[in-house]
Amino acid sequence: MNTDTQKHEDAMSTTTPARAPHDDAPSGQQPGQGRVGAGLFEPKQLVKSLPDAFRKLDPRVMAKSPVMFVVLVGSVLTTAFSVTEPGDWFGWTISAWLWLTVLFANLAEAVAEGRGKAQADTLRRAKTDTVARRADGTTVPGTGLTVGDLVVCEAGDVIPGDGDVVEGVASVDESAITGESAPVIRESGGDRSAVTGGTKVLSDRIVVRITTKPGETFIDRMINLVEGAARQKTPNEIALNILLASLTVVFLLACATLPPFADYAGTHLDMIVLVALLVCLIPTTIGALLSAIGIAGMDRLVQRNVLAMSGRAVEAAGDVSTLLLDKTGTITLGNRQAAEFVPVRGVTEAELADAAQLSSLADETPEGRSIVVLAKEKYGLRERHQGELVGAEWIGFTAQTRMSGVDADGRKVRKGAAGSVVAWVRERGGSGTEDADTAVERISAAGGTPLLVAVEDERGARVLGVVHLKDVVKQGMRERFDELRRMGIRTVMITGDNPLTAKAIADEAGVDDYLAEATPEDKMALIKREQAGGKLVAMTGDGTNDAPALAQADVGVAMNTGTSAAKEAGNMVDLDSNPTKLIEIVEIGKQLLITRGALTTFSIANDVAKYFAIIPALFAAVYPGLDKLNIMGLSSPDSAILSAVVFNALIILVLVPLALKGVRYRPTSADRMLRRNLGVYGLGGLVAPFIGIKLIDLIVSLIPGIG
């Protein structure tokens, strides 16, 4: 066993409160709470966002939203016409509310971005100017480091850049990144080697190989992303913008044909009235909130300590149809514990325990450590260390061999998956035993994990027995998988366990399918097979061997505790390193898509009421029959037009909290979800304007000269 690692973990356990493995939230925080909490409409946040809302009046910024750009142009036109007639209070009032419509839209986006900027400020405080000490003893500013440089970091040093530990082990304070106050272990080799620039070494000494250029570190990328500087419109967002622009062009052409009709009917349509009609008919509600919805979706992930590298990844999460979930840490608690030693006939428990402990001395996994501890506690075997075995050759575990062990003192000991160990024994002229097969089947059928232990010595190669590792399925997982099934999402458990063990745990947890004895190649093949069937796939990973699959998956969530290669390959990073959070990520993605669809439905539906308000007001005097369309009984043409414009602006402000918070998400099928949204937001979009415009008309009609 690596004594340095054990020493650090023992020291940490005495100074930090114990936590269950993979808690859903960092210590001291509630689940779902990120580094920076922010209310939807805190007064300070609104005040800070107002200057940004005015700055966004720049036509170059407004042009990114075709619908709101038309409203901006309309506001300028109505203001220009009102200037020519200073006494026209109707024109000035319309102009004022059109400007408010634009400002409300900008304010929604500014508030959404403001939450990200608050998080960026927190991250900036984590960035400090550092002086790096190279391995050769020379010093250089942190900004002068290049990829491949080796730097030495000791207790109290701030790590100058992103990299991998190539020598040593240390505890590191990553609270500036994750919000987690408890230090973490970073060591060379394995999947805990990645370190982040701006974090602080608390103890001992490590040598770090720099893997990123200055300005491209993890913190730099986080700042750019949460501030929105690197945010690009997603394909769905672009498609919706094209649809909204097309509707705007159609209504623009329709309004352009009205003046000739008015002239033919012997009446005149004022430009201010035409602009008001156009603004009320085009889908301003969703046009105003579309950008804020996308920004808020990424913000909800950040609040849960998940960093999405692009909005495309968040959308893909909402469309995922297959979830690949690692068993350990995601479905089970993660730390399997050795429960018993089951020797074959002719072998004593003490002999099996001795061999199992010996083969586990170099095994730094919780399972390996538990074998060493069980042998010590149950059979009185003293805890040995690697250094005691002079000339020993330690065989590390790999995903291909699926076993580990040691060659020392004239014998070879192996421990690992049953199939791999039996194959190793047979290659050396030995054979498996019926006792071992029976024990493997019994343990697997009970949902445990059997590890076979074998030895080759002067008596030949033979199986000694089985180590029983117990797995515990996390509470509530079956209910979560039932929810995913109702949403039409297929779940697949990925495990290196044998098929019997995998099936027992899959049945207990309630997943749809499982992939047993999985290698990285098997995982990649499964992803490609699912994608070939037109499905979007999401998965988690933390090791370098996960990198190809993370890059291939539509949603690849890398653990922050993982390797640099894994974090580079994924399109999301979970700062809490909680694999179970993948299910939450999918729910947030679906909530984003549902919110966008619901508000689009509402926006298009409420145009109907505005039509019944304005068209009769324009032509009822010339065509009395149109007065029948005035089903709201609006008091006058001017009042009808003004009421529609006021409602059009206020509804944006009313819906901003919904756009930022998201429509309430309930796990259900796509058909039921569609019917519900059409009922709530389609019908609501029809009814709300009739009520709102009528109430505003009652107030407006009291204004002299309009009512």
UniProtKB/Swiss-Prot annotation:
Active site: 326
Gene Ontology annotations of biological process type: potassium ion transmembrane transport
Pfam families attached to this UniProt entry: E1-E2_ATPase, Hydrolase
GO molecular-function terms, A-Z: ATP binding; ATP hydrolysis activity; magnesium ion binding; P-type potassium transmembrane transporter activity
Gene it is expressed from: kdpB
Protein name per Swiss-Prot or TrEMBL: Potassium-transporting ATPase ATP-binding subunit
GO cellular component: plasma membrane; potassium ion-transporting ATPase complex; potassium:proton antiporter complex
Localisation: Cell membrane
Entries under Gene3D superfamilies matching the protein: Calcium-transporting ATPase, cytoplasmic domain N (3.40.1110.10), Calcium-transporting ATPase, cytoplasmic transduction domain A (2.70.150.10), HAD superfamily/HAD-like (3.40.50.1000)
TM helices/strands, residue ranges: 61-81, 89-109, 238-258, 271-291, 612-632, 640-660, 683-703
Bilayer topology annotation: Multi-pass membrane protein
Family per similarity comment: Belongs to the cation transport ATPase (P-type) (TC 3.A.3) family. Type IA subfamily.
Top-level EC class: translocase
Binding residue positions for ATP: 363, 367, 397-404, 415
Sequence positions that bind Mg(2+): 542, 546
The keyword Cytoplasm is assigned to this record: no
InterPro entries noted in UniProt: ATPase_P-typ_cyto_dom_N, ATPase_P-typ_P_site, ATPase_P-typ_TM_dom_sf, ATPase_P-typ_transduc_dom_A_sf, HAD-like_sf, HAD_sf, P-type_ATPase_bsu_IA, P_typ_ATPase
The protein's role, per its UniProt record: Part of the high-affinity ATP-driven potassium transport (or Kdp) system, which catalyzes the hydrolysis of ATP coupled with the electrogenic transport of potassium into the cytoplasm. This subunit is responsible for energy coupling to the transport system and for the release of the potassium ions to the cytoplasm.
CDD domains: P-type_ATPase_K
Basic and acidic residues: bias regions: 1-11
